[in-house]
């Protein structure tokens, strides 16, 4: 196993632990808590794939971070922070909409790269809106946290989520997954629209690579 893969996992585990302690003091906002929950699932998946114990990895990650901080001057830290591009977190969904359980009468699931697409094929003749929570950098979607399809009544009928065991995806991966979800939902004569934020940052409102723009609400 590559040593960089192991040390990266160890550092991620320790940093998650620090963020969890921060959240336990009721200091985190909704996007912070959302990322914390998602990252926990991702770490569990990575730990299972790598065959590493999370508690042991957290202790090792702490030692790595402490060593780095001992060698880091305040001035170097300021320069590093200033040079890192800042991403924005956009939320179409509330925390309740993101965490709500949902069920499918006729479930269909497909994996596209590192994204899992789920939809209920029993849904027919409905008006559906796609909402997503995601981060944006340089004017483009950076990381999809979660996308869900809602009927006008508020029922969840579809979802696109990152696979915890396969972290990392591009905006092109998200576009392809959205296309699959829309195609599946339209099969039963449903009308599908997307949120304005998703339209703007995932599709950029243009015909990139021959795709028509998605209909927005």
From Swiss-Prot:
Subcellular location: Host nucleus; Host cytoplasm
Region annotation CPSF4-binding: where it falls in the sequence: 180-215
RNA-binding and homodimerization as annotated region, ranges: 1-73
UniProt keyword annotations, A-Z: Eukaryotic host gene expression shutoff by virus, Host cytoplasm, Host gene expression shutoff by virus, Host mRNA suppression by virus, Host nucleus, Host-virus interaction, Inhibition of host innate immune response by virus, Inhibition of host interferon signaling pathway by virus, Inhibition of host PKR by virus, Inhibition of host pre-mRNA processing by virus, Inhibition of host RIG-I by virus, Inhibition of host RLR pathway by virus, Interferon antiviral system evasion, RNA-binding, Ubl conjugation, Viral immunoevasion
UniProt GO cellular component terms: host cell cytoplasm; host cell nucleus
Motif Nuclear export signal: chain residues: 137-146
Record motif Nuclear localization signal, residues: 34-38
Highest taxon of source: Viruses
Keyword Ubl conjugation set for record: yes
SUPFAM superfamilies: Ns1 effector domain-like (SSF143021), S15/NS1 RNA-binding domain (SSF47060)
GO molecular-function terms, A-Z: protein serine/threonine kinase inhibitor activity; RNA binding
Modification comment: Upon interferon induction, ISGylated via host HERC5; this results in the impairment of NS1 interaction with RNA targets due to its inability to form homodimers and to interact with host EIF2AK2/PKR.
BP-aspect Gene Ontology terms: symbiont-mediated suppression of host cytoplasmic pattern recognition receptor signaling pathway via inhibition of RIG-I activity; symbiont-mediated suppression of host gene expression; symbiont-mediated suppression of host mRNA processing; symbiont-mediated suppression of host PKR/eIFalpha signaling; symbiont-mediated suppression of host type I interferon-mediated signaling pathway
Protein family according to the UniProt entry: Belongs to the influenza A viruses NS1 family.
Subunit structure: Homodimer. Interacts with host TRIM25 (via coiled coil); this interaction specifically inhibits TRIM25 multimerization and TRIM25-mediated RIGI CARD ubiquitination. Interacts with human EIF2AK2/PKR, CPSF4, IVNS1ABP and PABPN1.
Role description: Inhibits post-transcriptional processing of cellular pre-mRNA, by binding and inhibiting two cellular proteins that are required for the 3'-end processing of cellular pre-mRNAs: the 30 kDa cleavage and polyadenylation specificity factor/CPSF4 and the poly(A)-binding protein 2/PABPN1. In turn, unprocessed 3' end pre-mRNAs accumulate in the host nucleus and are no longer exported to the cytoplasm. Cellular protein synthesis is thereby shut off very early after virus infection.
Free-text note regarding domains: The dsRNA-binding region is required for suppression of RNA silencing.
Name used for this protein in its record: Non-structural protein 1
Organism in which the protein naturally occurs: Influenza A virus (strain A/Chicken/Pennsylvania/1370/1983 H5N2)
Encoding gene, per UniProt annotation: NS
């Amino acid at each position: 196993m590559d040593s960089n893969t192991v040390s990266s996992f160890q550092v991620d585990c320790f940093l998650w632990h620090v963020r969890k302690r921060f959240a336990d003091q009721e200091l985190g906002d909704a996007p912070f808590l959302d990322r914390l929950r998602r990252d926990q699932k991702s770490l569990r998946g990575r730990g299972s794939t790598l065959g590493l114990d999370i508690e042991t990895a957290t202790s090792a990650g702490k030692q790595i971070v402490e060593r780095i901080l001992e060698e880091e001057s305040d001035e170097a830290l300021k320069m590093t922070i200033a040079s890192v591009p800042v991403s924005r977190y956009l939320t179409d969904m509330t925390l309740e909409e993101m965490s709500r359980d949902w069920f499918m009468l006729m479930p269909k699931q497909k994996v596209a790269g590192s994204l899992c697409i789920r939809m209920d094929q029993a849904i027919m003749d409905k008006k559906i809106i796609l909402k997503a929570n995601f981060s944006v950098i340089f004017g483009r979607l950076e990381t999809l946290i979660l996308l869900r399809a809602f009927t006008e009544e508020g029922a969840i009928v579809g979802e696109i989520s990152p696979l915890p065991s396969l972290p990392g995806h591009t905006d092109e991966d998200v576009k392809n997954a959205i296309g699959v979800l829309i195609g599946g939902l339209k099969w039963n004569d449903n009308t599908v629209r997307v949120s304005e934020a998703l339209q703007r940052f995932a599709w950029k409102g243009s015909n990139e690579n021959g795709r028509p723009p998605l209909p927005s609400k």
